[in-house]
Amino acid sequence: MTDAAVSFAKDFLAGGVAAAISKTAVAPIERVKLLLQVQHASKQITADKQYKGIIDCVVRIPKEQGVLSFWRGNLANVIRHFPTQALNFAFKDKYKQIFLGGVDKRTQFWRYFAGNLASGGAAGATSLCFVYPLDFARTRLAADVGKAGAEREFRGLGDCLVKIYKSDGIKGLYQGFNVSVQGIIIYRAAYFGIYDTAKGMLPDPKNTHIVISWMIAQTVTAVAGLTSYPFDTVRRRMMMQSGRKGTDIMYTGTLDCWRKIARDEGGKAFFKGAWSNVLRGMGGAFALVLYDEIKKYT
């Protein structure tokens, strides 16, 4: 193997392992966030059974579905995030070579910043093309509030993918893809762009204390997450449409979804579950720092 191939493989492995660990740790928070986001578009959750907020959701899930249901859909999330994060981190460096070749970060700050934004956004959008059906399945499995057996909409990852494919074809597995690309570019641009720019401005980036790295990463993930959150809410709502027919279809398209959420639920609805998303972001920040630490020893 060439040095470039070895470097790419190390990036792939380090990013994937870091993501798998952090996502499993924050899976319960992720499920609460998803339920709050999509409950208005769920056929299983009637108006009188909707969750009132994070605490209500955390208390009711183990009572109604069992403690292990906090990790419902987590396998799909880990499978999805191994290639997603690994491809993001790996492609990020490849895109950086394209957008930042020959740029001096000290004398060309704004050119350096723009290059980081572009490389982060392009990396996120590229990886999303490959793993979107897994992202879709993860959302639908987490939104499934049936206790067991016949009450469940899907038996697992494979069952979810097969049922939606039979019902709606490949289009059903990519429902909400366009708004996802918009959101992922905004999120990744901030996630990688600001993080790398901030680290690049430190006196000695290679030997930055892990606490400083974590603080930078935590701020970046919180800001990036809130900025792109409305896009995430719309895409999750669109994902809930797949498999529906006739009058069960709530939104005719992405623009209709934006309009109806704003009209029927108000602007705050776009940010339902956002606080749990900030908490979940601690896992994302941890993954970013863990990736840097793993690379020091590889």
Curated annotation (Swiss-Prot):
The chain crosses the membrane at residues 8-37, 75-99, 110-130, 179-199, 211-231, 274-291. One of its GO terms (biological process) is erythrocyte differentiation. It is found in: Mitochondrion inner membrane; Membrane. Disulfide bonds: none annotated. It holds the Pfam family Mito_carr. The modification N-acetylmethionine is found at M1. ADP:ATP antiporter that mediates import of ADP into the mitochondrial matrix for ATP synthesis, and export of ATP out to fuel the cell. Cycles between the cytoplasmic-open state (c-state) and the matrix-open state (m-state): operates by the alternating access mechanism with a single substrate-binding site intermittently exposed to either the cytosolic (c-state) or matrix (m-state) side of the inner mitochondrial membrane. In addition to its ADP:ATP antiporter activity, also involved in mitochondrial uncoupling and mitochondrial permeability transition pore (mPTP) activity. This is ADP/ATP translocase 2. It comes from Pongo abelii.
